[in-house]
Amino acid sequence: MSRVAKAPVIHSANVEVTFVDGVITVKGPKGILTQKINKLVNIQHSKESNKLEFSPASNDPMGWAQAGTARALVRNMVQGVTEGYTVTLELVGVGYRAQSKDKSISLSLGYSHSIEYDLPKGVTVETPNNTTILLKGVDKQVLGQIASEIRAFRPPEPYKGKGVKYAGEQIVRKEAKKK
C-alpha cells in the first residue's frame, strides 16, 4: 500500500485546478499543464483549503500505486506552474562550448561539426558562460527529457570525465591501464 497517495497536495490560491473526464488541468502564473489520470484514481478537490486528495476508485490492487503516481504527477505540475523547474548542464573538456540562440542551442563537443538542438515550446535556455547550460520550463518531464538528449550527444567518459554532465553529478572514474 502506497503512502505517497495519502499525503494531500496543497497549492496556493493563484493556482486553478480543474478535473474533467479523467484529465486534470493546472493553471498558474507560469503556464498551463494537463495530464491524463488513470481511471483507478479518485481526486477530491477542496477549493476552500486549496487541497487535492487522492484515493483508489476501487479495491483493485493497483489502486494505491496509481493514486501515488497521480499525486506525484499533479504535485510536479503544481510546482511547475508556480515556481518552474531548472536543469543545469556542464560541459567538461577542451574546446567544448555552448551558445544559446532564440529557440535553439548550438553545441561544440569535439566533433567535426557543431550540433544544433531545437528546443520545444515552453522551454528556455541560458548560457551564463561557454561551459554551462541552464534549461528552464514548467514541465518537469519535458525538461528532463531535453537534458537527457543533450547529455547523450557526449556523455561523460570514465577516464578523464570529459563530456556533458548534470551539475553536481559525480562521474565514477577509472584508472588507466598499467604496464
Curated annotation (Swiss-Prot):
PROSITE patterns: RIBOSOMAL_L6_1. Transmembrane segments: none annotated. SUPFAM superfamilies: Ribosomal protein L6. Pfam families: Ribosomal_L6. GO terms for biological process: cytoplasmic translation. It comes from the Bacteria. Keywords: Ribonucleoprotein, Ribosomal protein, RNA-binding, rRNA-binding. One of its GO terms (cellular component) is cytosolic large ribosomal subunit. Gene3D superfamilies: Ribosomal protein L6, alpha-beta domain (3.90.930.12). InterPro entries: Ribosomal_uL6-like (IPR000702), Ribosomal_uL6-like_a/b-dom_sf (IPR036789), Ribosomal_uL6_a/b-dom (IPR020040), Ribosomal_uL6_bac-type (IPR019906), Ribosomal_uL6_CS (IPR002358). Belongs to the universal ribosomal protein uL6 family. NCBIfam families: L6_bact. This protein binds to the 23S rRNA, and is important in its secondary structure. It is located near the subunit interface in the base of the L7/L12 stalk, and near the tRNA binding site of the peptidyltransferase center. This is Large ribosomal subunit protein uL6. It comes from Legionella pneumophila subsp. pneumophila (strain Philadelphia 1 / ATCC 33152 / DSM 7513). The lineage of its organism: Bacteria, Pseudomonadati, Pseudomonadota, Gammaproteobacteria, Legionellales.
